[in-house]
Amino acid sequence: EEIGGIVPAEGITYEEISPQEAFLVRELRRRLSEHMGESSCFMYTKADQFEDWVKQRENNGDRIFVARDEEKIIAFMELSDSAENFVTEHPSMKNICGAYCLPEYRGKNIFQNLLNYVILILSREGSLYLGVDYESMNPTAYYFWRKYFKPYTCSVTRRIDGGEDRC
């Protein structure tokens, strides 16, 4: 069934899940964390840090949209009212603060359609802008997001606590 110009692949559906169902994307969050720890990102997260982080994410009330292949969740996109810089604090702006698609489903327009679905829902609700922050050392994110979004800020970071800077 076509949804606002989105023609899902056979068996693929898109929906928003409730905050109480946030645990349903836990495995995809783990896969995202593993991806960020691999080359070329090297943003490794220890198991206990991941558990603390995922509990916080599951309880923060952010909106989560998913793509399913039949009943299996194959991709998610998490949205927040705020993000990493002051520009995102506009009432008509929403921010993607987490996203992942299983590798075997990439290149099939599934994630693009999930993004289109999110945009459709947000525009119906009156949002005017959608932003996304991503790590520039993550080539998967860099090439995907820049196809669909225009850069509007530039941020840099420097570790100052004497620890190892892996960026």
Predicted regions span which residues?
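Acyl-donor-binding surface of acyltransferase catalytic domains
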Residues: 1-11, 142, 146-149, 153-163
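A short beta-loop-alpha structural element at the N-terminal edge
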Residues: 13-30
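Conserved GNAT-fold acetyl-CoA-binding loop/helix
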Residues: 34-53
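A short helix-loop-beta-strand connector motif used in the catalytic cores of GNAT acetyltransferases and
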Residues: 52-66, 95, 150-153
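Conserved beta-strand in the GNAT
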Residues: 66, 72-81, 95, 100
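Conserved acetyl-CoA binding element of GNAT-fold acetyltransferases
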Residues: 89-103, 157
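Conserved acetyl-CoA-binding loop-helix of GNAT-fold acetyltransferases
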Residues: 101, 107-124, 147
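Conserved GNAT acetyl-CoA-binding A-motif
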Residues: 122-134
